[in-house]
Regions:
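Pan-zinc metallopeptidase signature
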Residues: 178, 182-240
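Low-complexity, polar-biased intrinsically disordered regions enriched in Pro/Ser/Thr/Gly
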Residues: 83-90, 171, 196-205
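Acidic/His-rich structured neighborhood in mature extracellular/periplasmic domains
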Residues: 2, 10-14, 21-160
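Conserved aromatic-histidine-acidic binding/catalytic patches
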Residues: 28-32, 106-110, 170-182, 205-213
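Short, glycine-/small- and polar/acidic-enriched structural segments
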Residues: 7
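General secondary-structure edge motif
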Residues: 24, 98, 165-169, 205
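Post-HExxH zinc-binding segment in Zn-dependent metallohydrolases
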Residues: 126-200
Length: 240
């Protein structure tokens, strides 16, 4: 049994439920409600096939996700999922690289979390790899330069305080620079699509450009989002 087959067997031992979107897997622990997995499937489909023509909008991104076995894992709590990913699968011999490509989503999370976590997988495991100089999650890429502007400067680690003119002020010390880029992509795109427009009071300590109008001031990121080459979604996914 080769490494990939062994890893797949070990993964299926715990994640006994499976759905598929263009070859990308949504994996569920035994107690994950089927309706919640279908919700995740719908959101993934809409992010990837935003024009609803039953084909991926950006086949390069989808191929990257499939080839690298990037997947969404689901369970009733993040604690349960993380216990499987970080302990049991590693003990079973699944590589750390593979585990890092398995993104977690608790089924009891609100709808906004489904939009966020699934988009994280697409951008971090897809766009960042297909377009490394543009969306790569490291210093000096186009998106990193846009983020540095949004944060009021380059900060390898979370600063004690952000400059007053910053509009992206995430202060989670466990979120490193690459993680900050993942979150920045999420905040930018979802704000541009109108998803955050009624959430300012809830999110303003972390993110202030919560509408499309405000995002027009983020010139660097606005240009990336509107570049037709990248086929970035133009319509916010909806829950069926």
């Amino acid at each position: 049994m080769n490494g990939n087959a062994y890893a797949e067997t070990a993964i299926k031992k715990y994640f006994v439920k499976e759905l598929d979107v263009f070859g990308i897997k949504i994996l569920g622990l035994k107690n994950t409600p089927d309706t919640k997995m279908q919700n995740a499937k719908s959101i993934l489909e809409q992010w990837l096939d935003n024009d609803n023509d039953k084909k991926p909008d950006n086949i390069l991104v989808v191929n990257q996700l499939v080839e690298n076995n990037c997947s969404m894992t689901m369970g009733k709590s993040i604690r349960k999922i993380d216990n499987i990913l970080d302990k049991k699968l590693i003990k079973e011999g699944v590589s750390e690289t593979q585990v890092n490509r398995m993104f977690a989503l608790a089924s009891n999370e609100p709808e906004i979390a489904y939009l966020e976590e699934i988009l994280h997988m697409i951008t971090s495991c897809g766009y960042a790899k297909v377009y490394p100089k543009i969306f790569g999650e490291e210093k000096g890429t186009k998106i990193a330069l846009a983020m540095d502007k949004a944060r009021g400067g380059f900060f390898d680690k979370v600063p004690k305080s952000y400059p007053k003119d910053a509009w992206y002020t995430y202060d989670d010390k466990y979120c490193d620079y690459s993680c900050m880029i993942t979150e920045y992509f999420y905040w930018s795109l979802t704000s541009y699509l109108g998803i955050q427009k009624n959430r300012f009071d809830e999110i303003s300590e972390e993110w202030k450009f919560n509408t499309k109008e405000k995002m027009k001031k983020d010139l660097l990121m606005k240009d990336l989002l509107n570049n037709e080459k990248f086929k970035i979604p133009k319509i916010a996914p909806s829950f069926n």
